[in-house]
């Protein structure tokens, strides 16, 4: 069984964004083989299915990238023939927004490690937690000139909108903020290191779909939250980011989709999912309209395939690939 290699700062920080999507087929065979030993948990709610659906599409497009997806507990047994990626359980924002939830995450990591089949990589897949249930409201943020939105089910102050940091609690009435999630991931990373558990936790950005968020205050504050995650990760080169949002805001032709919020006459742009990434494929991988979201991941197959390609790149980097022709160890 392969042990996850801790990424080395000297070879560049691991950030899987739109710039790496087309590099999935540059991965040397030895690192493709290494990824095929990995057990990956991308736990979340409906949006987490995009991580699985894309992998099945990639395997169909190119059988080099063998995969087994799962939504079962226990997850699949060890194999060196295919990447194992899925979620053994549903996970909502309460997992990071409450002490009890964070305790359960740590316990789940430890319990899986005790089976001898540890998770190699784990991450929390955001749903619409940054935007839904509580629309923009509360007191205007004097720095960013927005009102915050979002849900915090299971948090100490209840289900309320939330901002970026503790200081925003006076604006939202909620002690939960984006820093709650970021500090929670850091805490799980320390927990794994302290107990010598070979599980690498990563950070994730969240969804950029949702028509009501397109060109709105809700979408603009969502982008601020994503940028806050990116800044946190950039502050420590050992942190790893899967930039779900950025991957989906760009299409396969290298075009970024930007929406415009008309804030009382001031145009304030924010990134939004590219319409191409809401499209599907036919059997020959020609792009077609998505009739309905039958797979339940809220994005099209075009977007899901982009996620899968970026995931293989990231996992190969975690396994020791330097992103070029060499190894980090």
Regions found by a protein language model. Give the residues of each.
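Histidine-centered active-site loop/cap adjacent to the catalytic His
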Residues: 241, 264-326
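N-terminal module-boundary/linker segments of secreted carbohydrate-active enzymes
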Residues: 11-68, 77, 297-301, 316-326
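Loop/turn elements at helix/coil->beta-strand transitions in domains of secreted/extracellular proteins
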Residues: 36-39, 62-67, 116-123, 194-202, ...
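The substrate-binding groove and active-site-proximal loops of carbohydrate-active enzymes
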Residues: 160-181, 214-219, 298-301
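Substrate-gating cap/lid alpha-helix
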Residues: 206-253
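A structural motif corresponding to the C-terminal end of an alpha-helix
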Residues: 184-201, 228-241, 317, 321
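Conserved SGNH/GDSL esterase-like catalytic core that processes O-acyl groups on lipids
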Residues: 47-171
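Bacterial N-terminal signal peptides
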Residues: 1-7
């Amino acid at each position: 069984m392969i042990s996850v290699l801790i990424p080395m700062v000297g070879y560049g920080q691991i950030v899987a964004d739109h710039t790496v999507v087309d590099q999935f087929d540059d991965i040397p065979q030895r690192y493709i083989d290494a990824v095929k030993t990995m057990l990956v948990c991308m736990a979340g709610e409906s949006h987490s299915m995009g991580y699985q659906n894309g992998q099945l599409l990639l395997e169909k497009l190119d059988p080099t990238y063998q995969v087994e997806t799962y939504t079962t507990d226990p997850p699949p047994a060890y194999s060196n023939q295919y990447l194992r990626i899925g979620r053994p359980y549903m996970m909502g924002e309460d997992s990071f927004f409450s002490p009890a939830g964070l305790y359960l995450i740590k316990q789940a990591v430890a319990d899986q490690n005790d089976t001898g089949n540890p998770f190699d990589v784990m991450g929390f897949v955001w749903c619409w937690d940054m935007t839904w249930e509580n629309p923009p409201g509360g007191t205007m943020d004097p720095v960013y000139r927005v009102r915050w939105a979002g849900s915090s089910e299971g948090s100490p102050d209840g289900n309320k909108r939330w901002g970026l940091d503790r200081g925003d609690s006076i604006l939202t009435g909620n002690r939960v903020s984006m820093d709650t999630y970021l500090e929670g991931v850091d805490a799980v990373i320390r927990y794994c290191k302290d107990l010598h558990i070979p599980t690498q936790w990563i950070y994730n950005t969240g969804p950029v779909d949702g028509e009501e968020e397109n060109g709105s205050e809700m979408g603009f504050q969502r982008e601020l939250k994503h940028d806050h995650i990116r800044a946190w990760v950039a502050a420590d080169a050992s942190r790893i980011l899967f930039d779900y949002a950025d991957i989906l805001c760009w299409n396969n032709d290298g075009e970024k989709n930007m929406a415009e919020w008309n804030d009382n006459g001031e145009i304030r742009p924010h990134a939004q999912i590219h319409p191409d990434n809401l499209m599907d494929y036919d059997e020959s991988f020609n792009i077609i309209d998505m009739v309905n979201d039958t797979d339940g991941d809220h994005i099209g197959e075009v977007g899901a395939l982009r996620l899968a390609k970026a995931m293989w790149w990231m996992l190969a980097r975690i396994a020791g690939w330097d992103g070029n022709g060499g190894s980090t160890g």
